[in-house]
Regions:
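Short, acidic/polar linear motifs in exposed loop/turn regions
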Residues: 62-65, 127, 181-184
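N-terminal secretory signal peptides that target proteins for export/translocation
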Residues: 1-13
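N-terminal signal peptide c-region/cleavage motif recognized by signal peptidases
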Residues: 29-31
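Beta-sheet-dominated interaction scaffolds and their linkers
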Residues: 35-58, 158-171
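Short beta-strand and strand-turn-strand segments in soluble, beta-rich domains
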Residues: 68-70, 74-89, 187
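Terminal connector regions
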Residues: 108-154
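Intrinsically disordered, low-complexity Pro/Gly/Ser/Thr-rich segments with frequent PxxP/GP/PP motifs
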Residues: 81-109
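Buried hydrophobic-core signal for structured, non-transmembrane domains
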Residues: 54-60, 103, 119-124, 176-180
């Protein structure tokens, strides 16, 4: 191998290391900014049958921003159907504050009682606008956090902690299929 080839290879390695370092630095900067804003207190909500309500915490981690929070529940197809009511459905949240959403069952026992039912809990955070910037061109994004809401009937045949043991796997050609014979959604 000639000196020229070695120098080119070292130059490529140095360039690669510099680019990787810049990419890592930029990722760390973005991750630091991701801490600010609105966060939900759970990654999913389980609504046990018979309860009057369940709660979901919403936190504004941004010290300097106020958000308008809008929340609602959709069915598994993504359509609002009024089977669950969220209160308050709309409120303003100042910086470094927490509020609790209450989810109320309005199904009148019309959901299947032999298995869980899937819904989507949606929380939209709309940032406030600084009045001094109203004359400027600005881009503001409203973020919707969407988590699963499971309605769990009271008398399911299998306890939830035994559901994972009942899962089965089937292998065929180049795929692996998971078979869930339980009444639970397992995620």
């Amino acid at each position: 191998m000639s000196n020229k080839n070695v120098n080119v290879r070292k130059s490529q390695e140095i360039t690669f290391c510099l680019l990787a370092g810049i990419l890592i630095f930029m990722a760390m900067m973005v991750a630091g900014r991701a801490e600010a804003g609105v966060a939900l207190g759970a990654t999913r909500v389980i609504y046990p049958a018979g309860q009057k309500q369940v709660q979901l915490a919403v936190t504004n981690n941004d010290e300097n921003s106020t958000y308008l929070i809008q929340s609602w529940v959709e069915n598994a197809d993504g359509v609002k159907d009024g089977r669950f009511i969220v209160t308050p459905p709309l409120f303003a949240m100042k910086g470094k504050k927490e509020n609790t959403l209450r989810i109320l069952d309005a199904t009148n026992n019309q959901l299947p009682q032999d298995r869980e039912s899937l819904f989507w809990m949606n929380v939209k955070a709309i940032p406030s606008m600084d009045k001094s910037k109203l004359t400027e061109n600005t881009l503001q994004l409203a973020i919707i956090s969407r988590i699963k809401l499971y309605y769990r009937p009271a008398k399911l045949a299998l306890p939830p902690d035994q559901a994972a043991e009942k899962l089965r796997f089937r292998r065929s050609a180049n795929s692996l299929t998971l078979i869930n014979p339980t009444p639970y959604y397992l995620t």
